[in-house]
């Protein structure tokens, strides 16, 4: 029976304390989080120290900066005073939302207020989080400065004396980087097991090789491919570089869960799917929730396919934009990642958009601009619409209305001269489909639109010539029988010859009764491979020349093209085709990611000659290393083309010399092996002679008859074992290749 209160002893009173009951689970469950309600506050340090009568004036001046990243007011700024009625050099500011407070920290921290003062902006809760007891040492300890180590040259491969190109090869669990040696075996640069868990990807200028892991993305570079930068993003699945390699976008289907004390990620990234990184600093600029994963799913509205790239970059990296399908396009300014004009561009029904891949100077337009093209479907009685928008003004500079639209695809020419709008139209009964092309001539005054409506079937693939004004498309009519690949037609288009500007686009030739479904232009233009990929029955690669130097057909004389099929080759199970950055070589690959039959890659010349076949077990990925843009001016490039025949003679001599060196290497190897054999034979004979002397055998003891008749030495005590060695030289030859 428990004692009554009156009978409790001193020991009984403290008995419960001694048991030390653990309440940590209850504390964790009911603890009041200080972040709640305070995540909209920031602390601004580095302000001028002013008397009370100047405080309001300083606050108004400060608000000019504060309102560039969000919304706040004079009442939401608290600037404390000391006993002398002087400000303390800091202030507390409340924003309307936590997102605005985060933007203030990222965009205003370290910015100058005037010539003498620099703003230092921190979240109020960061001061509590990092400044609480035990987090900061009472005594100052100087930081440990590591000794200077010179970094590797990140573009060293461009200095190869033979101007060779590199490629990355992913097979099995190994990734290697190799030099291309034409028909000779590739030369290994580095080869590592478990270098990546998902895939590898070159940056657009070839500076970095990215490997993807469950922990994040790792960039490698330099002659030895050492570690350059790390971007922690748990369970990252997709990555995208900006055109100039300044920024990196990473995406994961799983929202990020940030652990306390993480060296890079903060609670601002918690729960996000997308991070935009600064490659130079290795720090996140801003993080976002994926539109496709936001909100609850229902049976009526199934989960949409992930839009990738989620962010699309302008040609000069000054802007990056993302689309909320059907509603708006949000354009952000770099490097601050603030929303342009503080608002998204509201576009009802917007389905897709694309930036111009180059900065365009339109006729009659002097101010700086980047161009963006988007389209909207038919909504009610309103027609579908394609529009060109100028950024940063957000002005619509050209629109085009479309009717009976099923789908639209936007295709920019690499220099931004044209944008082709591929419009799939249905008949009024919606039983048949056809395609026409609306080509915007962007650089011409008023942006005129040319319509190509001579196509009777649906276009399934379209591709502009790089740095040119020609294009290739593939059409298909009615579907073929079960199991049979659809019959397609390949059409080549070129402009008419009309002065400096490209004339109207005309059909050069159509190749019927094909199964082709993919188009791969040389990065230098002129040559194009039209292929059948991901097929179970057809594997043809057609190598075409658009500027054949032979005789021209009469009906093509007025067009800026002379079409010629150079060669057709087959590659069983082909899934991917990759041009090298110089346009000299083409690699066709059969990836194990698609099928397990005869995986490997073949190397071809631009004209279709197969230089090497490389069957490779568990082959997954082949990627040529990109090259940065040339540093030569247009005039210097023109001079190089003019003297190309002279250079080609030098190249032919170098190729011949390389072949001679290869033959010489073979001869030297054979001589070395022969000399090693002769030396070994001499050494063995010397050992044999020593053994004969040790056992008192005659010189002819190695002959069968002499060994049998040899006298026995009875002076030795015990038994003597004589080993008979029989050596026969079957054949000995010496071959020397000149």
Curated annotation (Swiss-Prot):
Chain segments carrying region Disordered: 1-20, 693-720
GO cellular component entries: cytoplasmic stress granule; eukaryotic 43S preinitiation complex; eukaryotic 48S preinitiation complex; eukaryotic translation initiation factor 3 complex; eukaryotic translation initiation factor 3 complex, eIF3e; eukaryotic translation initiation factor 3 complex, eIF3m; multi-eIF complex
Pfam families assigned: eIF2A, RRM_1
Domain RRM: 40-126
Primary location group: cytoplasm
Keyword 4Fe-4S: no
Biased composition annotated in UniProt, kind: Basic and acidic residues: 702-720
GO MF terms held by the record: identical protein binding; RNA binding; translation initiation factor activity; translation initiation factor binding
Alphabetized UniProt keyword annotations: Cytoplasm, Initiation factor, Protein biosynthesis, Repeat, RNA-binding, WD repeat
WD repeats: 193-230, 232-289, 301-342, 454-494, 511-554, 569-607
Extent of Polar residues compositional bias: 1-10
Subcellular location: Cytoplasm
Alphabetized HAMAP family for the sequence: eIF3b (MF_03001)
Subunit-structure text: Component of the eukaryotic translation initiation factor 3 (eIF-3) complex.
Function as written in the Swiss-Prot or TrEMBL entry: RNA-binding component of the eukaryotic translation initiation factor 3 (eIF-3) complex, which is involved in protein synthesis of a specialized repertoire of mRNAs and, together with other initiation factors, stimulates binding of mRNA and methionyl-tRNAi to the 40S ribosome. The eIF-3 complex specifically targets and initiates translation of a subset of mRNAs involved in cell proliferation.
Protein family membership: Belongs to the eIF-3 subunit B family.
Protein name per UniProt: Eukaryotic translation initiation factor 3 subunit B
Gene (name only): prt1
């Amino acid at each position: 029976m428990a004692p009554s209160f009156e009978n409790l002893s001193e020991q009984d009173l403290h008995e419960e304390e001694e048991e030390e009951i653990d309440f940590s689970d209850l504390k964790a469950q009911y603890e009041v989080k200080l972040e709640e309600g305070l995540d909209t506050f920031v602390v601004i340090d580095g302000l001028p120290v002013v008397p009370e009568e100047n405080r309001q004036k300083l606050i108004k001046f400060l608000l000019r900066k504060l309102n560039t990243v969000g919304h706040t007011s004079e009442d939401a700024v608290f600037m404390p005073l000391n006993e002398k009625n002087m400000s303390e050099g800091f202030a507390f500011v409340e924003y309307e939302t936590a997102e605005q407070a985060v933007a203030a920290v990222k965009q205003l921290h370290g910015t100058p207020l005037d010539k003498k003062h620099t703003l230092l902006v921190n979240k109020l809760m960061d001061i509590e989080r990092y400044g609480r007891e035990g987090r900061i040492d009472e005594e100052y300890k100087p930081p440990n400065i590591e000794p200077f180590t010179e970094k590797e040259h990140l573009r060293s491969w461009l200095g190869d004396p033979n101007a060779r190109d590199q490629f990355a090869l992913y097979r099995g669990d190994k990734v290697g980087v190799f030099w291309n040696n034409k028909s000779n075996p590739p030369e290994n640069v580095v080869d590592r097991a478990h270098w990546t868990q998902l895939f590898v990807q070159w940056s657009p200028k070839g500076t970095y090789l990215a490997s993807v892991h469950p922990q994040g993305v790792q960039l490698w570079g330099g002659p030895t491919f050492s570690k350059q930068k790390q971007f922690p993003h748990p369970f990252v699945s997709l990555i995208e570089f900006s055109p100039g390699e300044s920024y990196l976008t990473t995406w994961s289907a799983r929202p990020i869960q940030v652990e306390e004390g993480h060296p890079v990620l903060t609670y601002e990234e918690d729960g996000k799917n997308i991070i935009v990184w600064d490659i130079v600093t290795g720090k996140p600029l801003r993080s976002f929730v994926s539109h496709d994963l936001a909100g609850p799913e229902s049976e009526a509205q199934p989960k949409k396919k992930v839009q990738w790239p989620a962010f699309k970059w302008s040609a000069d990296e000054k802007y990056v934009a993302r689309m909320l399908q059907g509603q708006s396009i949000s354009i952000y300014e770099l490097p601050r990642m603030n929303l342009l004009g503080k608002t998204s561009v509201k576009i009802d029904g917007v389905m897709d958009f694309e930036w111009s891949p180059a900065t365009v100077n339109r006729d009659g337009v002097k101010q700086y601009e980047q161009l963006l093209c988007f389209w909207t479907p038919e909504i009610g009685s309103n027609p579908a619409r394609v529009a060109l928008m100028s950024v940063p003004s957000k002005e619509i500079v050209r629109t085009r209305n479309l009717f009976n639209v099923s789908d639209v695809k936007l295709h920019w020419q690499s220099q931004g001269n044209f944008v082709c709008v591929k419009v799939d139209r249905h008949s009024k009964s919606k039983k048949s489909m056809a395609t026409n092309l609306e080509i915007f001539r962007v650089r011409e005054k008023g942006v005129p639109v040319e319509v190509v409506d001579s196509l009777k079937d649906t276009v399934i693939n379209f591709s502009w010539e790089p740095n040119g004004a020609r294009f290739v498309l593939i059409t298909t009519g009615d579907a073929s029988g079960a199991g049979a690949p659809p019959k397609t037609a390949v059409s080549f288009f070129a402009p008419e010859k009309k002065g400096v500007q490209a004339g109207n686009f005309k059909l050069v030739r159509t190749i019927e009764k094909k199964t082709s479904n993919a188009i791969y232009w040389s990065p230098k233009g002129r040559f194009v491979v039209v292929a059948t990929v991901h097929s179970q029955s057809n594997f043809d690669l057609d190598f075409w020349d658009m500027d054949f130097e032979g005789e021209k057909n009469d009906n093509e004389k007025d067009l800026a093209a002379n079409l010629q099929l150079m060669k057709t080759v087959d590659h069983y199970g082909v899934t991917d085709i990759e041009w090298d950055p110089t346009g000299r070589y083409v690699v066709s690959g059969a990836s194990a990611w698609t099928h397990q039959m005869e995986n490997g890659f073949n190397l071809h010349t631009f004209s279709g000659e197969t230089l090497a076949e490389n069957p490779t077990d568990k082959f997954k990925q082949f990627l040529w290393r990109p090259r940065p843009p040339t540093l030569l001016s247009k005039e210097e490039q023109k001079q190089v083309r003019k003297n190309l025949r002279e250079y080609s003679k030098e190249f032919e001599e170098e190729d011949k010399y390389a072949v001679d060196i290869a033959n010489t290497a073979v001869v030297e190897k054979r001589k070395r092996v022969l000399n090693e054999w002769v030396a070994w034979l001499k050494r063995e004979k010397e050992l044999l002679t020593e053994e004969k002397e040790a056992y008192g055998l005659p010189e002819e003891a190695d002959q069968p008859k002499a060994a049998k008749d040899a006298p026995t030495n009875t002076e030795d005590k015990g038994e003597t074992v004589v080993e008979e060695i029989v050596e026969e030289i079957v054949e000995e030859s010496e071959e020397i290749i000149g």
